[in-house]
Amino acid sequence: MNRLYPKSPTKFLRITRPLLVSLLLINPGIELFAEELTNSTELEGKASKVISDTKTSAKKAKSSTDKNTEAATTLKTMEVSETKDKKLAAATAEVALTPGGVTLLNINELRDRNVSNMADVLRYAPGVYSTSQSGNDEVFVSSRGSNLDANNYAASGVKYLQDGLPITAADGNNHNRMIDPLSANYATVARGGNALKYGASTMGGAIDFTSPTALNSPMTRLTLNGGSFGQFLGRGTVSKVFNESLDGLLTIEGKEWDGYRAHNKQDRIGIYGNFGWQISSSVVNRTFLSYIKNNQQLPGQLTRAQFNANPYQASAQALGGNYQLNTETERVANKTTWTIDDKSSFDVGFSFENQHLYHPIVDTVLVPNANFQQGGMNDAFSMLVDSTQQDWGTAARYNRHFDSHDLLVGLNVGTNSDRGGNYVNKGGLKGAMSNAITKKADNIEIFAQDHWHLTDKWTLTPAIQGVFSHREVNNARLAIPQDGQPLVAPFVAPPQYNVRNFYSQGGNASNDYTGFNPSLGLMYNLTKNASLYTNATRLYAPPTNYNIADNITSGSSTTNLKAMEGTSVEMGTRGKQSINALNSVNWDLALYYSWLNNEILSVTPASGSPIASNFNNTVHAGVEGLIGGNFALDSKGTHTIRPMLSYTVNSFNFDNDRTYGNNALPAAPDYFLKGEAMYHHSAGYFMGPTFDVVGKRWGDYANTYKIDSYGLLGMR
């Protein structure tokens, strides 16, 4: 029996919304404070000290002589605060030691913004172009020119991690990966070869999200956010430190959105939790659990004429095919940290994720069929993907400080299995199966890095990484009836239609890939808080299984796709300079140039599906910058202006390609600037303008279609 899958979680949201509020507001002994924010209202139990002070006051009322209880309560508050400061300080120190482009995003500071998807979190990360094409969680992310192909739904080129454990699949794809942007305390964005500490060697690098725990969170927090086009985001968090050994945190969140275009609704629910166990004074274990159910309607693409006529409409194909991207994901992870002594530590963890995808994405296309018995216009193809993907990951890290060295040795092991198939799309309902598809991937990354402090001013950072990968795709084409009639032969469209359709393609392909990638960085400390750096790094990225599936020819047993290889050089500076006690500036500037061989790009022929191929020579180069400051308007710092500007200049081109010459790669703009200039009052009030300026970008490899530049001006 066909049905739309999965069912909408809207009813769940409407039922749980009042329960969520009640859970957080009905909490005897804890005082809640209201705080007005732009586009949101946050009711938050004032971190640890306020909670502790409330408890202490209650105990005083009960017994004014119980001094020991009061002292114990105060001491606990200091421990929680110290834990929080140490985690952020360690992350900041690691960024400061990296001789390349790395940005630390404090997500707690984003809670006074309208953050609804990944693009909002990455807004001020230089070098990373991120945008939601329709305003929902389907976000396009390109870091240093990664993911610039017709097959960008796989979202490859950037490795996502959560608490150091993989979110990205073992083959490198991020298809349907959704990380709730507010489920983390901070995120580390390491671009290009600077992500080697995570085992990544791709062009885009890695982004690691670090989760909050009960040790660095308020006991209760409620956030409500509303906006135009039916936007509602709600999340509630409760946490508790049970004793010196056990703690736990639980978050329930939901998102509803009608969308600014037709057929653009989204319903999402998420449940996240983590539980810590201090096994001994030197061993800590933490378990992470998450569940996400995310239903999204996809409005499809518009031509320029259609957009100019009505930018709010959905495409006819999206409506006819009832395009959707519906996922249900369960994930469990566990991580143990052993502090061996004051100079060494060992981390080991594992993760498992199960994801079900229901994805009507291609409406019925009609073309003449030369082999069809009755002739005339008949189905060329349509597609609905229904599959289940499972990912297993293991990560281990050993850190050792000795003499003037900070050594890191690491291992990542990942396995991916994706089983399901493509079906005839009957207006969003599942028809007959056209292709039974199984994908498998294994990936091993071994890496080592040393920060060698030559002097107080100079630090040398040699590193090396090894990649061992296996890819395998089995695509069994099934005979299906067309318009109630059996096929007398495999589908053949007349040559002028150039249709490489989903029904006719079958075959199996597998291959193994091995690469060794050295890196060498050098840093010079100008002052305690400012430095210059440079590095040279080898880049390496095997194809994803989506690339291989788009490269299979019928009956083949291997793929001719090679791994992308390249060399990147980089130089830059970052730092913070205090002008006086109330005024300061901070900056982060990087320039890089990368020569790539065998970059994997998927080119879409007219009326066909993407074909993945290697391109011999491409160049990725750019300038990345982030500058900000804090400037007092009076002698006490009551009134301050805090400007911030992120800017990126891109140059991504073919290099004497036999087909495309020196054309620019599509999708990424020539430049983009994102900034704000906020006024802050010491009482917590703020307001100011925000702006975006995005340059032109090409829509195809032949550079025949250009997407105009644009600017946005806002206020918060």
Predicted regions, residues:
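Extracytoplasmic beta-strand/coil segments of soluble accessory domains associated
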Residues: 87, 91-94, 99, 119-165
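Short acidic/polar hinge/loop motifs at secondary-structure boundaries
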Residues: 130, 158, 164-191
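Transmembrane beta-barrel wall of Gram-negative outer-membrane proteins
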Residues: 219-221, 226-256, 261-299, 323-345, ...
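Face-selective signature of the C-terminal outer-membrane beta-barrel domain
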Residues: 278-290, 325-494, 587-591, 627-630, ...
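Structural signature of Gram-negative outer-membrane beta-barrels, strongest in the C-terminal barrel
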Residues: 280, 401-414, 437-594, 678
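Gram-negative outer-membrane beta-barrel transporters
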Residues: 456, 460, 468, 584-597, ...
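Membrane-embedded beta-barrel scaffold of Gram-negative outer-membrane proteins
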Residues: 345-363, 525, 531-537, 562-630, ...
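N-terminal periplasmic "start-of-domain" segments of outer-membrane beta-barrel proteins
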Residues: 59, 66-67, 76-113, 139-142, ...
